[in-house]
């Protein structure tokens, strides 16, 4: 009994579902997050279930749009809009004009839903900006600032016809930035110094990170070395992870402290003394839920999200929000001595799925898993865990 249950969970697939208000058109998606791998973007794949009698010769069109909101909705007056919408894809889904082979997920879903189900695929352009949401404050109203993606399928005579809400389905999706470490990447570092008037010698600060690319949830370690060749005294040290946000449309720049520590260990650093210490910080979105303006990796209503990933493919005419991160080390020397600051840039991103090498243990395990899936699908129906956008529920073919 136990092995049978384990096989049952192996073949279970989570599916997102949403139905039009009139119940005549339903859209199924296998996932809502689509990755940008740098050289290519994952396509938006799903299945459409439509009542043919309701169509009456009309067609089903689909579109993927991105909305860049750079101002608050409550400030939009007299026809002034602080948003810009771009159509990334607009195609006829039914009857389809493409001759593409459906994916395994689409085939399984079509077999389950029957002859009224039709697969569809939309390709996202490589230069499309990633999803970013600026976290709203407790008093903010309206839609949050940032870059949002939406998939919409609707019934109409032509693609130029304005969709009606009663026979259209809109689903929020996200475009995430994936990255993988480069073997040629160098350790980021910075070396700064400060001289003082009416005083000989300089204060020197060197900051080095253990690597350039970090994934969400990783700890960031900074090796700080302070050499005091001046006559001043370092009284306090502060290390922080700072998120830099650039809103390209309005040329706005924002700086938010994500994580910080303040230490007096090893202080005061008197003239002629040195200090070398490693400081570790953990930048997480969960620790900044109350901070207004923190950039996140898009925000879906169903769950939490990460901090916004670093913008890896930024160009001079980029439309969207450019994100970067720095480790900032600040030395305090009192009111007269002032401060010494060093910034070291690093990248924060989602890990790119690791491809399976043929012949490896992972490859053999996946092949065995696929073999068991095929065998089980022949012996019993495959279960689908369907998550409705309006409410969550589960159903199985065995109970239908």
Curated annotation (Swiss-Prot):
Keyword Ribosomal protein assigned: no
One GO term of the biological process aspect: G protein-coupled receptor internalization
Pfam families, per the entry: Arrestin_C (PF02752), Arrestin_N (PF00339)
Modification(s) after translation: Phosphorylated.
Keyword Cell division set for record: no
UniProt keyword terms in alphabetical order: Phosphoprotein, Sensory transduction, Vision
UniProt signal peptide: none
GO molecular function, one term: G protein-coupled receptor binding
Record's GO cellular component terms: cytoplasm
Source superkingdom: Eukaryota
Family statement: Belongs to the arrestin family.
Cited function: Plays an important role in the photoreceptor transduction.
Protein name as catalogued: Arrestin, lateral eye
């Amino acid at each position: 009994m136990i092995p049978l249950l384990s096989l049952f969970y192996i073949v279970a697939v989570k599916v997102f579902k949403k139905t039009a208000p009139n119940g005549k058109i339903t859209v199924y998606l296998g996932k809502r997050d689509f990755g940008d791998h740098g050289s290519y973007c994952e396509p938006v794949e799903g299945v459409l279930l439509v009542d043919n009698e309701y169509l009456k010769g009309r067609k089903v069109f689909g579109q993927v749009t991105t909305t860049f909101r750079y101002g608050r909705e409550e400030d939009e007056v007299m026809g002034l809009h602080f948003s810009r919408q771009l159509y990334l894809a607009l195609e006829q889904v039914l009857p389809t004009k493409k001759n593409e082979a459906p994916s395994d997920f689409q085939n399984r879903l079509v077999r389950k839903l029957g002859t009224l189900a039709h697969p569809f695929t939309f390709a996202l352009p490589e230069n499309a900006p990633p999803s970013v949401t600026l976290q709203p404050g407790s008093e903010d109203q309206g839609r949050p600032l940032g870059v949002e993606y939406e998939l919409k399928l609707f019934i109409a005579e032509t693609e130029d016809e304005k969709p009606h809400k009663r026979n259209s389905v809109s689903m929020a999706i996200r475009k995430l930035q994936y990255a993988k470490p480069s073997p040629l990447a160098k350790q980021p570092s910075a070396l700064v110094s400060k001289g003082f008037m009416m005083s000989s010698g300089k204060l020197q600060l060197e900051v080095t990170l253990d690597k350039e690319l970090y994934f969400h949830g990783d700890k960031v370690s900074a090796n700080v070395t302070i050499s005091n060749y001046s006559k001043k005294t370092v009284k306090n040290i502060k290390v922080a992870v700072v998120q830099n946000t650039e809103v390209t449309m309005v040329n706005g720049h924002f700086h938010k402290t994500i994580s910080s520590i303040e230490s007096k260990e090893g202080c005061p650093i008197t003239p002629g003394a040195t200090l070398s210490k490693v400081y570790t910080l953990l930048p997480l979105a969960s620790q900044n839920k109350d901070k207004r303006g923190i950039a996140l990796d898009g925000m879906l209503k169903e769950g939490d999200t990460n901090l916004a990933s670093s913008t890896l493919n930024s160009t001079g005419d980029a439309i969207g929000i450019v994100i970067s991160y720095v480790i900032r080390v600040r030395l305090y020397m009192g009111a007269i001595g002032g401060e010494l600051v060093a910034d070291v840039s690093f990248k924060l991103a989602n890990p790119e799925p690791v491809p399976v090498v043929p012949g490896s243990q992972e490859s053999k395990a996946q092949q065995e898993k696929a073999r068991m899936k095929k065998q089980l699908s022949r012996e019993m129906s495959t279960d689908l865990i369907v998550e409705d956008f309006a409410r969550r529920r589960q159903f199985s073919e065995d109970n239908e």
